[in-house]
Amino acid sequence: STTNAAGAVYDTYLSNFRNEDGSVNWLPVCADAHGFVVNKDLFEKYDIPLPTDYESFVSACQAFDKVGVRGFTADYSYDYTCMETLQGLSASELSSVDGRKWRTIYSDPDNTKREGLDSTVWPEAFERMEQFIQDTGLSQDDLDMNYDDVVEMYKSGKLAMYFGSSAGVKMFQDQGINTTFLPFFQQNGEKWLMTTPYFQIALN
C-alpha cells in the first residue's frame, strides 16, 4: 500500500478488503472516457466542418457564434469540471518528462513534504487554459452552468459541443440526436482523451 500505484487508490479499499495474508485482489473495470460530446446534426445543418485539431475546433466555435449557437461550454458550476478541463488541456505538459516527474512526486505516499504546483509545468498549463477560455468564449456566466443546463441547451440545438463523459454519446443517440465524441485537441497537434474508472473493486 506504499507504492505509487496503490497511492492512487482510495485508502478505504486497501484497508477494508484484505485477505488474511494482507494481500488485496483486484478486478479490472472499464474506464469512462472524457472529452467533447459533439452534436453532428448542428455541424451538418450549418455546414461547419467537424474539428480535427485545435485550430479547427476554435474555428467551429467562432462559426457557431455567428449563427447564434453556442459552440462550447460545460457544467462549470462544479469545481471538478474546471479541474478536469485543465487536466485535459494540459495533457501534453503533464506527460512530458517534467510533467511525469512532478506527478510522481505529487502522488508518492512516501513523500512527507507538501508538494504544490511547480514553476515548470503549471505556468504553461494555466496559459493554455486562459487561451482556451478566450478561444471558446467562456465567461463568468458559464460558472453558473450545471449539468441539466448543459443537457437542455444541447438537446434544444443551442449548444454544439460540451465537455463530458462518453456516456453522453449513447444517451443522445438514443434520443435521435446524431452525436459523436472528440478528444482534447492540444495546441501542439496531439489528441488526448481522459479516462477514469467508474469504480474500483477489491475482493477478499
Language-model-detected regions and their locations in the chain:
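Alpha-to-beta junction loops
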Residues: 67-71, 156-164, 177
